[in-house]
């Protein structure tokens, strides 16, 4: 498994962003080898969060599986992050990312870490605006 981490300094991080990007918030996206969680696997998990020791910095972390056998390592890395991040923000995550993740945890015989997490799906939040922004 390849792990890449970059920390961005954001001293000008707007107060409006800080209202939803709190210390316990994890921005999450996954990349998969296909659309079926039963037949395909996760090869990349991307996460962003406020850096623990620097409130004016954002950490971006990517976990990349070079082969399917490394998927369990990706899931374990996400589990570790979710120990300190209890709110997940995704785009269409309630319909795709989270169900896919839950199935892959099950297939890999790893306990799912989502029981204590709150999910915010930006796609669902913005759906009522789709006519306004011509989606």
Spans of model-derived segments:
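N-terminal accessory regions of nucleic-acid-interacting proteins
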Residues: 1-24
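Short, flexible, glycine/charge-rich loop motifs used to bind or transfer phosphoryl groups or to couple energy/partner
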Residues: 14-18, 35, 78-79, 108-109
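RNase H-like nuclease fold core
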Residues: 32, 36-51, 60
């Amino acid at each position: 498994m390849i792990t890449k981490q970059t920390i961005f300094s954001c001293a000008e991080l707007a107060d409006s962003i800080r209202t939803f990007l709190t210390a316990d918030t994890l921005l999450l996206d996954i990349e998969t080898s296909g659309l079926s969680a039963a037949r395909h696997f996760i090869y990349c998990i991307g996460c962003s969060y406020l850096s623990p020791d620097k409130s004016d910095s954002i950490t971006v972390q990517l976990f990349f599986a070079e082969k399917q056998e490394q998927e369990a390592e990706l899931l374990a890395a996400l589990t570790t992050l979710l120990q300190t991040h209890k709110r997940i923000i995704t785009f269409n995550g309630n319909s795709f990312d989270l169900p896919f993740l839950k199935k892959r945890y099950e297939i890999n015989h790893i306990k799912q870490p989502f029981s204590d997490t709150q999910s915010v799906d930006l796609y669902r939040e913005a759906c009522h605006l789709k006519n306004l922004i011509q989606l």
